[in-house]
Amino acid sequence: MSEPIRVLVTGAAGQIAYSLLYSIGNGSVFGKDQPIILVLLDITPMMGVLDGVLMELQDCALPLLKDVIATDKEEIAFKDLDVAILVGSMPRRDGMERKDLLKANVKIFKCQGAALDKYAKKSVKVIVVGNPANTNCLTASKSAPSIPKENFSCLTRLDHNRAKAQIALKLGVTSDDVKNVIIWGNHSSTQYPDVNHAKVKLQGKEVGVYEALKDDSWLKGEFITTVQQRGAAVIKARKLSSAMSAAKAICDHVRDIWFGTPEGEFVSMGIISDGNSYGIPDDLLYSFPVTIKDKTWKVVEGLPINDFSREKMDLTAKELAEEKETAFEFLASA
């Protein structure tokens, strides 16, 4: 057995965490021979609920779970971390402007970034889930100057999985048969789900998605809006935001960081845009197609970008630049 790793989940009394914690504890994310010390952080009013979650994790009697720590104190939560999954954020309330949401979250992620900087291992991998995820991730990274910015990523894997699922449903195959879809940009309704480079396995051979579907107007229209608005559709139907699918996407994202991506396959994640070859401005936290090896991501280079894609990629970059500007004004005054 290897040494236990310390894994933090914030917002640990919430819906997403409730769907996520069992998968982390049972070896689905870090492997079946990796012991784990699981650290659960939430705000003080949630500590009663968190106690219940702690009891349930104990009652799961998971052999890999060496310890579970529930706390509302950052100096305990962020100590010596190997992995931080930042799920907790201020949710958007009715009538709340996106700007107000940004302001509340800048405060949270500035504090958590500073706590990572002060207490966590410098090799910590930080995954931001709480919305607005891209800008929250950038805020945390800026507030943790001693941790390499490449160690920070935000979740667009849920959008990626949603795109795969839509293509699979349309073609009557399983999601497994679809690969190399891309989510460009922000985890918001401006994201651009791109299947120009995606492949699908049909009758044992790989075909381009455009060629397989022969329905360009669906791919350039309804498909894109369905993926962009899927989160809102789930809320409308379930009266709660996506939790099971979000937790599954977090597992996929973190597992790929840990073990790498399969040969010939790429995935989507929000990462720092510095030095990219797709004309996206530097210093944005933008979702790109990446491959991962030895816990290090690399942007997939050289994919041809048509005019339709270019426009969509620039639009979501513009939104991210505006969010960043607003967040940094708050950051300066926070």
UniProtKB/Swiss-Prot annotation:
NAD(+) binds at G11, A12, A13, G14, Q15, I16, A17, D42, N105, Q112, V129, G130, N131. The keyword Flavoprotein does not apply. The modification N6-acetyllysine is found at K118, K121, K298. The modification N-acetylserine is found at S2. The active site is at H187. ISGylated. GO terms for biological process: malate metabolic process; malate-aspartate shuttle; NADH metabolic process; NADP metabolic process; oxaloacetate metabolic process; tricarboxylic acid cycle. It is found in: Cytoplasm, Cytosol. The modification Omega-N-methylarginine is found at R230. It comes from the Eukaryota. The modification N6-succinyllysine is found at K110, K214, K298, K318. It holds the Pfam family Ldh_1_N. Keywords: Acetylation, Cytoplasm, Methylation, NAD, Oxidoreductase, Phosphoprotein, Tricarboxylic acid cycle, Ubl conjugation. CDD domains: MDH_cytoplasmic_cytosolic. The modification Phosphoserine is found at S217, S241, S309, S333. The keyword Cell inner membrane does not apply. Its EC number is 1.1.1.37, 1.1.1.96. GO terms for molecular function: hydroxyphenylpyruvate reductase activity; L-malate dehydrogenase (NAD+) activity. One of its GO terms (cellular component) is centrosome. Homodimer. HAMAP family: Malate_dehydrog_2 (MF_01517). Catalyzes the reduction of aromatic alpha-keto acids in the presence of NADH. Plays essential roles in the malate-aspartate shuttle and the tricarboxylic acid cycle, important in mitochondrial NADH supply for oxidative phosphorylation. Catalyzes the reduction of 2-oxoglutarate to 2-hydroxyglutarate, leading to elevated reactive oxygen species (ROS). This is Malate dehydrogenase, cytoplasmic.
